[in-house]
């Protein structure tokens, strides 16, 4: 079987364009070496392999490797390390990938990113077969259609691997998952293998950055743009310059940055990076509901967006004017307090106000969304006042970062099983409060069920999905510093007025 698998994988490389006919013998010999084989057996049978067969062929190869003692452990962590090593035999060198990207970029930026995105999938850096497992649906709300996904593509670590990670030697190389040094890295039990990972160098605002795709692809062409230096996230004047520099180079992509403070920031604050992609989020589709003008920037369109979070949208043909106005708004917000609205710029010397910025090109104009954030905590809300409140934690407890802000819920994998069990329990009339797993959902279910007269096997999961969408809408409303009521919007207007003082 391993002989056939090797032939299949080489054929896969040829079919996807990862290797050429000139690479065929070389690649075959590298795979023979990996599996400790001395020769390729004679075979008259023609082999072929589709993209859909990759998962199964790699699984067979790993089963063989484990049986032969080539792979010492057989859990998901070790299998991921080894199948990445297998795929590395097919992946072009970084210089070849960069050269091909640059050649295509001369024709069009979109052709270049199309090539790189396909490559990132063909190399199995983006595991198509795992991404397919994610549960996705669209939830209609008063703010438009929100995207909901239950993330199932990140494998759960088994107890043995978790224990091994605890006792493994702690390494500072690479410093984090976003560092340049990940390219080609073999990985270890507490750090993923990246031999099949490639990075495109880009110059952003005069400094060296890298461009890659997220292996988890939460939306179409989900890319990460990261500083070549391991330096912390910081929202400042240069951030806006960098965002627009990227958009000018890749005008079909949006790009945004997580905020630079805990709670309201992303999961990696230690390494300066942006996220972007070829996708239109619900927030980008949301309309400006009222406009305003900032003195000295009469040439810039500005307004408040109809969105559950507090978003200022500015637009102009000259990106430099947007950078200048964004700088004014950021500076004003950093130092802004409004006790009546429970907005405090700092407490005990700890800063609370920051911004989540998102840049895009729309037609002939550049556009920048500035989402106002505040990370203050209280005894009542120890995880954050402007963070999902406790009554929503049964669905979403994690930080609300850039992706969620724009209208895509990334929900924990536990919800798949919980929602399936919840469906069974509701249909059978079981007492949710007596079920340890489902008890946390009881108040929620009791609140929404009376609204639906037709509850049956055919309708219930759709109802649950709709209500998860409503919870996510509330999550975003909780995270908004200015609430979507008369009092909250009056407070928002006070901040806008302060820009002209």
Model-derived regions, located:
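Active-site microenvironments that recognize anionic phosphate/pyrophosphate groups
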Residues: 1-225, 229-232, 306-308, 322-326, ...
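Helical scaffold of the NTase/Pol beta-like nucleotidyltransferase catalytic core
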Residues: 196-198, 230-255
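Generic structural signal marking isolated hydrophobic packing positions
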Residues: 227, 273-274
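Catalytic or ion-translocation cores adjacent to nucleophile or general acid/base/metal-coordination motifs
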Residues: 238, 247-270, 276-337
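Generic detector of intrinsically disordered, low-complexity, polar/charged segments
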Residues: 262-263, 274, 398, 404
């Amino acid at each position: 079987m391993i002989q056939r698998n090797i032939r299949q994988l080489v054929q896969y490389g040829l079919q996807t364009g990862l290797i050429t006919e000139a690479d065929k013998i070389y690649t075959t010999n590298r795979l023979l070496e990996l599996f400790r084989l001395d020769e390729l057996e004679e075979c008259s049978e023609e082999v072929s392999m589709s993209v859909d067969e990759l998962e199964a062929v790699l699984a067979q190869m790993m089963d063989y490797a484990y049986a032969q003692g080539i792979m010492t452990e057989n859990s998901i962590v070790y299998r991921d390390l080894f199948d990445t090593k297998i795929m590395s035999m097919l992946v072009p060198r970084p210089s070849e990938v960069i050269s091909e990207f640059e050649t295509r970029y001369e024709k069009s930026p979109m052709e270049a990113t199309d090539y790189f995105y396909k490559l990132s999938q063909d190399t199995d850096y983006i595991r198509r077969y795992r991404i397919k497992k994610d549960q996705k649906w669209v939830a209609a709300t008063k703010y438009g259609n929100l995207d909901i996904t239950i993330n199932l593509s990140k494998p759960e670590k088994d107890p043995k691997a978790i224990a091994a990670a605890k006792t493994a030697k702690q390494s500072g190389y690479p410093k984090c998952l976003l560092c340049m040094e990940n390219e080609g890295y073999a990985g270890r039990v507490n750090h993923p293998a990246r031999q099949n990972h490639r990075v495109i160098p880009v110059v952003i605002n005069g400094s060296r950055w890298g461009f890659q795709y997220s292996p988890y692809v939460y939306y179409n062409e989900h890319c990460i743009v990261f500083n070549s230096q391991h330096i912390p996230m910081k929202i400042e004047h240069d951030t806006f310059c960098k965002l627009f520099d990227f958009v000018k180079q890749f005008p079909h992509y949006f790009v945004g940055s997580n905020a630079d403070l805990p709670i309201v920031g992303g999961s990696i604050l230690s390494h300066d990076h942006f996220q972007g992609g070829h996708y239109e989020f619900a927030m980008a589709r949301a309309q400006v509901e009222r406009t305003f003008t900032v003195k000295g920037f009469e040439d810039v369109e500005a307004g408040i967006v109809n969105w559950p979070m507090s978003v200022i949208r500015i637009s102009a043909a000259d990106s430099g004017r947007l950078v200048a106005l964004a700088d004014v708004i950021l500076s004003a917000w950093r130092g802004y307090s409004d006790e009546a609205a429970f907005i405090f710029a700092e407490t005990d010397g700890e800063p609370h106000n920051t911004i989540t910025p998102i840049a895009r090109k729309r037609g002939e104009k550049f556009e920048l969304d500035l989402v106002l954030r505040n990370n203050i905590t209280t005894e009542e809300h120890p995880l954050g006042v402007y963070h999902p409140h406790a009554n929503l934690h049964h669905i979403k407890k994690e930080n609300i970062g850039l992706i969620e802000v724009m209208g895509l819920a990334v929900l924990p994998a536990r919800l798949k099983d919980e929602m399936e069990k919840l469906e069974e329990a509701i249909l059978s009339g079981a007492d949710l409060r007596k079920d340890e797993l489902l008890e946390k959902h009881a108040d929620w279910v009791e609140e929404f069920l009376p609204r639906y007269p037709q509850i049956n096997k055919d309708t219930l999961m759709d109802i649950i999905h709709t209500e998860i969408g409503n919870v996510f809408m509330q999550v975003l409303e909780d995270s908004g510093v200015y609430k979507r009521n008369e009092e909250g919007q009056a407070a928002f207007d006070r901040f806008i007025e302060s820009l002209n003082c």
